Regions:
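Active-site-proximal loop/helix segments of hydrolase catalytic cores
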Residues: 38, 104-171
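Zn-dependent metallo-beta-lactamase
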Residues: 1-22, 80, 86-89, 94, ...
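Portal/gating segments that form or line small-molecule/metal binding sites
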Residues: 61-127
């Protein structure tokens, strides 16, 4: 990629997103059967799991690679990727990654378990992948996260649309990317509509987000992405 090429962010459904920068490709929360629009497996240099305790586990499939937690299988197309699934600070292929402990509920994980939100610095752009977070952030957590440009936020999970909007007010990103989680399309549409109303947003759906550090908007905008993933 040339130096002027934008970072690309593609959503593959649920909490799976792929960030392509100049030096590396990051795939967050890949599920075992994820493939791209062409039917080929998605590839990447770095894989992050925001909820390793409950990530999809393939059973009866010969191909796959265990992540560091020892239970989660990642797609074979990501065999060579560097896997991150816990809190901490990392640098891989010029990508700075900060994993911050979060929870999938508002009860310190006692109901739905722990999670990890990852801040990914790619091409000078700070993107936070919130995974399946279920709560607002404390001042301490906000300090650990720092300033973010793009926020990928779950909609339709344990985090209500109102709390999701409040979380975005806490983080104050330039771009908000909703990730719908519901199993029922109707529930997803309702939750997304409520979130967009809370945000005061009327976004247009697009296949991917392409952005550079210099092209980030001055005020927060919400971008709806088409799900590019499909079951293998």
């Amino acid at each position: 990629m040339s130096e002027s090429a934008p970072m690309e962010l593609i959503w593959y459904g649920r909490t799976c997103v792929r960030l392509r920068g100049k030096e590396a490709v990051v795939v967050a929360d890949p599920y075992q059967s994820v493939v791209g629009p062409t039917g080929r497996g998605i590839t990447g240099d770095i894989v992050t799991f925001s909820h390793p305790d409950d990530a999809p586990v393939a059973r009866g499939k010969p191909k796959g690679k265990l992540s560091r937690d020892g239970t989660t299988l990642i797609p074979s197309s990501l065999d060579a990727a560097f896997v991150l699934d816990g809190p901490g600070e990392y640098e891989v292929k010029e990508v700075l990654v900060t994993g911050v402990r979060t929870y999938r509920d508002d009860a310190k994980g006692s109901e739905h378990g722990k999670g990890v939100s990852f801040v990914l610095e790619v091409d000078g752009i700070h993107t936070i992948h919130l995974g399946e977070i279920g709560h607002l952030l404390s001042e301490e957590k906000l300090g650990d996260i720092g300033a973010v440009d793009i926020a990928c936020v779950p909609i339709g999970g344990t985090l209500s649309p109102t709390k999701a909007a409040a979380l975005m007010a806490q983080l104050d990103p330039k771009i908000v990317v909703p990730m719908t989680l519901c199993d029922d399309d109707g529930d997803c549409a309702e939750a997304l509509a409520k979130f967009l109303h809370e945000m005061g947003a009327e976004p247009v759906t697009q296949p991917k987000l392409s952005v550079t550090a210099s092209s980030l908007p001055g005020e927060t905008m919400t971008v709806l992405l088409e799900s590019r993933g499909k079951q293998a």
